[in-house]
Amino acid sequence: MKTFAETAKAYLALTKPRVIELLLVATIPAMLQAARGEVNFGLILLTLIGGWMGAGAANTFNNVVDHDIDQLMRRTRRRPTARQTVSVGEARVFAWVLLIASVLWLGFLCHSWLAAGFIVLTNWFYVFVYTKWLKRRTWQNVIWGGAAGCMPVIVGWAVITDNNGGAFHAGWSSWLQAIILFMIIFFWTPPHTWALGMRYREDYEAAGVPMMPVVKPPLQVTRQILAYTWAAVITSLLLVPAASWIYLAAALISGGWFIIKAHMLHQGVKNGTPVKPMQLFFLSNNYLSILFVALSVDAVLGWQTLAHAVLG
């Protein structure tokens, strides 16, 4: 019989805390930039809790749907539903509880039913479009399915706008920044995930998941990794006018580092030399963290944006 601590640990594992950690890192800079120069720590904390429950629900639903293929992969076979430490039925109930709690939390405590709606939309897309359909049918699963992982910035932005006059009051220029943040993560996701796929290619193949590294030649994979890396870095520069030199410096330095590492991986595959794709995987995490920490600092300080400095 499992102890309470063991049961709690298993349920926590269903939410994939490491994945959520990265998602929440994206929520904070979005909220700070949306309220540039003004910091409401209480609202940010409440949003993070609501966002954690929403993301935890999506990840738990993912465990429910994928429990069969998780049993076939070394990287995932220790997940609670794969090991049956938590039954599929119990996990499904837990996911629904988290989702409902997230919606009510964001709606009533964060005063943003728009953000709550985005949480529902994200869960629907992640579970039905990505997990049940794209993931098992096409190598483009990561490209389009990755849109769900971009939603924390939209949720965070929605909370701020709903607490400052509403989404329509914010105007298109404000939401354009949110869309740019969304697209940064959208373009960042494929190189991040395909690098992992190159390392665990045999696992995905054994589970019948058509990840790009499984169905395409390595050179084609690294070529796509390179293209999406460039796209992510270039997109990050679109936010420069709405920030100061702090963000600009971080975007250029970390972006250059990201591109160089992607080029090294591609060149290694092209030359037929041994490569270490996990180096790019971990570096991609560092890139996004550096970029968003810099944006957070930039927004909190509220220094003059480069657009105002140039245009007056």
Curated annotation (Swiss-Prot):
It comes from the Bacteria. GO terms for biological process: heme O biosynthetic process. Keywords: Cell membrane, Heme biosynthesis, Membrane, Transferase, Transmembrane, Transmembrane helix. InterPro entries: Protohaem_IX_farnesylTrfase, UbiA_prenyltransferase, UbiA_sf. It comes from Corynebacterium jeikeium (strain K411). PANTHER family: 4-HYDROXYBENZOATE SOLANESYLTRANSFERASE (PTHR43448:SF7), PROTOHEME IX FARNESYLTRANSFERASE, MITOCHONDRIAL (PTHR43448). This is Protoheme IX farnesyltransferase. The chain crosses the membrane at residues 12-32, 41-61, 93-113, 114-134, 141-161, 168-188, 240-260, 290-310. The lineage of its organism: Bacteria, Bacillati, Actinomycetota, Actinomycetes, Mycobacteriales. GO terms for molecular function: protoheme IX farnesyltransferase activity. It is a multi-pass membrane protein. The keyword Acetylation does not apply. It catalyses: heme b + (2E,6E)-farnesyl diphosphate + H2O = Fe(II)-heme o + diphosphate. Pathway: Porphyrin-containing compound metabolism; heme O biosynthesis; heme O from protoheme: step 1/1. The gene is ctaB. It is an enzyme of class 2 (transferase). Converts heme B (protoheme IX) to heme O by substitution of the vinyl group on carbon 2 of heme B porphyrin ring with a hydroxyethyl farnesyl side group.
